[in-house]
């Protein structure tokens, strides 16, 4: 939540500028370390400390938000698929431009108990595993509503900000 909320303005402008930066955001649907407040990624209707009657706000679609802002690399991974996560991080770091890696990660204490009503961390882990599928280029969600994992978007055609600035500086010095 913090990256999408408090840090959201910085994230959007880094994507807009296509700064050569890799952001890895752990998405656990909640502000878990501060007591369980609603976050920008909290599911609609979820019960939290700050939405006791259910979250009346729809969560950000970070993929669409950042793609619209100008991000040139977007991957969504899960801690339930560590090899895919490792590969996405390597690919994101190698990518020239703004790379965003969303990592679905359980928060068994706050989100697990309060939002999803799980009794154990392993129950939440199993739920995460059941909610995901590998990305198919046609859709970011499968037909059965599962969340698509993988590299969802790459644009290698946009220039990276620092390269543009260096080119301008060099042209100016001639």
Per-region residue spans from a language model:
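Short beta-strand segments
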Residues: 22-27, 102-104, 152
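Short, hinge-like loop/turn segments at secondary-structure boundaries
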Residues: 14, 39-43, 117-120
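Short acidic, glycine/serine/threonine-rich loops at helix termini
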Residues: 6-10, 33-38, 111-116, 163-164
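Flexible, low-complexity linker and terminal segments
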Residues: 105-174
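Conserved thiamine diphosphate
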Residues: 39-91
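Histidine- and/or cysteine-centered catalytic micro-motif in compact active-site loops
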Residues: 36, 79-80, 104-106
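Thiamine diphosphate
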Residues: 1-32, 86-87
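Generic secondary-structure signature for well-ordered alpha-helical cores
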Residues: 16-19, 29, 64-72, 90-97, ...
